[in-house]
Amino acid sequence: MTATGKREWTPDQLAAIRARRANILVAAAAGAGKTAVLVERIIQRLTDPEDPVSLENLLVVTFTEAAAAEMRQRIGAALEAAVARDPENEALRRQLLLLNRAHISTIHSFCLWVLRTYFYRLDLDPGFRVMDPAEVDLMQLEVMDRVLEEAFAAEPDGGPVTDLADSLGGRGDANLVDLVLRVWEFSRSLPWPEAWLEQVTSSYKVTPETPLESLPWYGELRQMITLELQEAAWYLEQARQAAAAPGGPAVYLDNLENEKEQVTRLLEEVGDLPWEELNAKLAAVHFGRLKAARGEDVDPVLKERAGKLRNQARDLLYALKEDLCRDEAAVRAELERSGELVATLVGLVRRFDAALREAKGRRNLIDFSDLEHLCLRVLLDEGAGPGRLQPSDVALELRQRFAEVLVDEYQDINTVQDAILALVSRQDVAENNLFMVGDVKQSIYRFRLANPDLFLAKYRQYPEGEGGPNRRILLKANFRSRQGVVDGVNFIFRQVFSPLVGELEYDAAAALVGRAGYPENPAAATPAVEVYLQEGKVAAGTGAGGRTDLPEAVGAGKGGKISGGAGYGETLSGYGAASPGGETGAPDLEDLTALEREALLVARRIRRMVRGTPERPGPEFQVWDQEKKEYRDLTYRDIVILLRATRDRAPVFLEALKQYGIPAYADLGSGYFAATEIETILSLLRVIDNPHQDIPLAAVLRSPIVGLSAGDLARIRLAAPGEDFFTAVVKAAGAPLLPFTARESAAPSSTATGSGGALDNQPGQDPVCIAPYIEDTQEPWRDDHPGPGAAAGKAVPGKDRDLASLLREFLARLERWRTLARRQPLGDVIWQLYRETGYLEFVGGLPGGAQRQANLRALLDRARQFEGFARHGLFRFLRFIERLQQNEGDLGTARALGENEDVVRVMSIHRAKGLEFPVVIVAGLGKGFNLRDLSGDFLLHGRLGLVPLYLDAAAGIKYPTLPYLATGHRLRLEALSEELRILYVALTRAREKLILAGTVRDLPRQAENWCASLFLPGEQLPPVLTSRAGNPLDWLLPALARHPDAAAIRDLAGVGGGHLLPDPSSWQVEVVRGGELPDRGSEEPGVQVRVTAGYQGTESAGQQENPGLLCSGWPGGSRELAGAVTPVQETAGKTVAPPGSNIAEAGVEPGVSPPAGAVSPQDETGPTWLQQEVARRLAWTYPRQPLTALPVKLTVTDLKRRFDVFNEGETPLRPGENTFTRRPAFLQSHQGLTAAERGTATHLVLQHVDLSRPVTGESLAGLLQEMVEREILTPEQAAAVDIRAIVTFFAAPLGKRLLARWEQVKRELPFSLAVPAVELYPGLPAEAAAGEIILVQGIIDCLVEEEDGFLLLDFKTGRIPPDPLAAYREQVRFYTRAVETIFNRNVKEVHLYFLDGGVDFKVTS
């Protein structure tokens, strides 16, 4: 369907709709209308006048339940329309009646139907229940605990399992548990998991006669070596071309040609050589020393380019040699050790699988994995096995029943699911009936064990022509995106996709063909694609306090402007007024992370698009409304921000959007357990389960449920310093010991009761309050346990209750709640807690209240679901939650926002799959790929098996074996292919405008790397380069650099020529360099901004947001908290209390009420309580105030100044003392280089001196010239270097020691050392400074490793002080301490060498 709503089937779509009697694979590109084609095919099958089928004879398999519901709805709508056109057609009416019984479902729902129908074939109890995922996790962890406990018990003196656990390391057995579960889960994605486990084990049973070259991993190792050699050859060829160019360093040519010949020859032989010969030839690769390229005719740019490329090739090959260097005997020894580890691991997996099956069978439970495997058992004949899919009589029966099997999103199925579909579809030539739709470029669920190779195999095998048993049909037309978006997407992916990275060619068959047909509109978005590149570091001294215009920008693409940053982001904290005129103050750019600045950039761009600028208010452009069939102004709901992952990044964008007054929403699917309201209720449940848990108990007491202050908790702690906190609470309450209290009985003490006691509430102290408004059904406490006010003869009614009575009330309720937990179902207990405390209503009044309430209701729902588990109870529920958190699990936040609200959505790319938006912003493109799975102790691959590092816990050895390197190479290529497909999904969500944003460090250097693509022939980027990508920008920018509109990137790299690719796409490219925070501009006062998320921050509800609201001293508490909370209105950013409330009258903040006996505000005989409270708070001082003035870090030079006794008039720095005494540079008259600048230049030369050959005046002169050419030194700095002094040093005995051991010399070695603060500032109070450290940083000029220790040299270029050893002793002491700490070797000598006088001072300890 086009944008205008006209349904005009393309020839390819018609072919997919009408093709019959063949297995058909429809490769549908993004926006190709595959769902519409699938629905139309079904309708035409149902209404075919010659061969109609019934809905009950179709099997339609979708990827999600939502997709199945949509498919059912579309089919129903089409049938209703057909009935409306032909109301007398009984067959159509019957199909409508059959719709709800039709097999339109996910693969799991179909498997469940098979098991419910044919349960007797498996001796399966028909009353089985499918476990909730939470139950599955809990059962797996419980079973794993039991399996490991038995395994360790069988090895009291150690054994294979203990060895494996020790080799994996980590705290406890968490790493081993995770590994066993991961291997088990992976095996269950295969049709015959036991056969795969056996294959994995047997692959390590290698005899001495087995050639290494025959093992499955060796082919991958060869490919890895080949790619490395190809990359090195490419670098060398580029270096050779630079050297051979006019003005190039021609003297490099001999070396470059020789080195390239070595690599080329090895490339030709790598496929045929056995390992021993290949290893020897790799070890023989050698790079010699380049000749010096001098003279005015040598272009420094070409010289630097040639040298840099050659060094890249050298470093790459030397690293390869180091990784692979081992003989065949060593390889076989590694295989033997790996085999031992794998056999032990597989044994644990088998034991776990058997124990889990037994546990599930005992309770008549199955999980989703069981659904697939049990269904497969029903459908397989007894003689079936790996590679032999022989259908059972049930499978043959279903083949006859289903006239056609239609599969949506075929690229996302796994091997087990594919086997099930093959068994229920017809396989004979005349009656093939499997119809598969998908797009392998959108296969992004490998982490869920989807196998895109299944789609690719059929894609390559099936022909496009008609007549055969199998057929491939391509749907290339894109009905979603404007032509500009389509052209931009094609331009990028045509260059990047390859069989190596992406796993297919992006050729004419894969490219998009624009067919959206948007009507012309001058106000539509143009250009369709924008790119914003931001530098990750900010220049020192920049900030928001200066200019308010945009950061400096360098260049722009066609139609673009040279401008700087824009804004990003949004927030989580519910409602808040936009800051008029930036009242809250603009943050300093140096205080913002790169992600925060990128989020601000995105937010500012959104605000401009929707609201315009002061000069041009209103939306920047219009979008097409598909429902109204007309153009309309852009709104927030038209915009989505897509991120690779949202868990830690979406909150940053939410906050930035809030700063710009932009409503936004993010359904993160995580952060549930971090939500304050969930933490509070879980803490309460933990206390109910076991009150002797200090942290949960303190959390509950401090929470709004009780509302104690930090001072109250401290006073409680003092009541029983040596006991647990609950015992302290009991003693502080002066309460009798309840049945669940600990160890001993204690009568009320003077510290807990009586006037003037430590726990009394005195005027001026933090107000103590408990939730006095919760339902009070308890008997009053006995008179023999009076509160602290009783000793003074004062009553303790209502709001004037003291701490002890509040604690007694809490303890009484806690005992009742514990009794309730033993008698009632868990869900009822939680609901009773909500009802009694009023906490559910309370959080509803906080910012983000709807989300908070949704989270609490979700906890209640999950507790009730948990009750379905046979072994239920509060303890097990809490244990399940804890284990889930330990394994980094999350239940996902509850959804609290409708889809049609006018907000910007922030979501992950995975969640956006299948959706489309008028404006798509893909952000975070500079974020590195997450390849953590490639660096674990064990690698896991379907074909290559289980591959461990070489692990020897006893010897403390861990390193990669050859199979590990080969498997890691294969997994890396597969992971990169997945990331490329994810990027394709992101870019193809856009209908009318696509915006790309990313941040990288050292932008000019990165641009130079990206622009290397300009010197490559052909259109497709070499796979050896795309396989080296570290983030999406490493694909996007090398491709985009070749576009005529990308001048900004080429200018940044300093590249003027190269190979540009003419293309119809139009791009706007803006580069943001350093700079300042973009101006947020003036916001209209009173704007209320809602920004919510399926995530809550860690602020303490009711403390930071509305302190003590539950504890407010308002009279007349109701039975539930909700009735006692007075609503607070927000108007134009100001908080306004309701008329007549005591907040408005007394000016007291909510939740702060006078303690018992305080003077009322109307009492004029003395200071009011409020005045006392204000005075107390103003008089408070921070107990560790001296530490606030300490520096976080010091340099060794700073320390030298502190201890320099020869600087008359100076005194050691004191904390907080101002050290800025130099005049600003712009006020200084320029009198040539300063002594410090001359010293810096000299140190740079000493750092670059070639120590492998004699140091002469001539060699140093050549070095200085080269450093000037490379812009390391300016000519003025080079002229200031004293060559003669350096030559003198190297001619002296000390210099000769450096030259003699030049390979062991380390120069300009930076270090950081943590030093106790009291060591540097002895005058600090001991208590205040306890545990405080200061980071000392420095750079060691020269360190020489000799046989018996280190020789440390510190070069000096200034004057020689009267006593140099005393002047620099503290400085070299820290140098020595750092070296000995870092290298764990002694420093035997320290020398100060003054170059100006050629004087050597040996420093003694």
Curated annotation (Swiss-Prot):
Protein role: The heterodimer acts as both an ATP-dependent DNA helicase and an ATP-dependent, dual-direction single-stranded exonuclease. Recognizes the chi site generating a DNA molecule suitable for the initiation of homologous recombination. The AddA nuclease domain is required for chi fragment generation; this subunit has the helicase and 3' -> 5' nuclease activities.
Biased composition (Low complexity): 787-796
Organism per entry: Moorella thermoacetica (strain ATCC 39073 / JCM 9320)
SUPFAM superfamilies xref list: P-loop containing nucleoside triphosphate hydrolases (SSF52540), Restriction endonuclease-like (SSF52980)
Pfam families, A to Z: PDDEXK_1, UvrD-helicase, UvrD_C
Disordered as annotated region, ranges: 778-797, 1132-1165
Descriptive protein name: ATP-dependent helicase/nuclease subunit A
Gene3D superfamilies: 3.90.320.10, P-loop containing nucleotide triphosphate hydrolases
Domain UvrD-like helicase ATP-binding, first and last residues per copy: 7-482
Transmembrane segments: none
Domain UvrD-like helicase C-terminal: from-to ranges: 551-914
Cysteine pairings via disulfide bonds: none
EC identifiers of the protein: 3.1.-.-, 5.6.2.4
UniProt-listed CDD domains: DEXQc_UvrD (cd17932)
Keywords noted in UniProt: ATP-binding, DNA damage, DNA repair, DNA-binding, Exonuclease, Helicase, Hydrolase, Isomerase, Nuclease, Nucleotide-binding
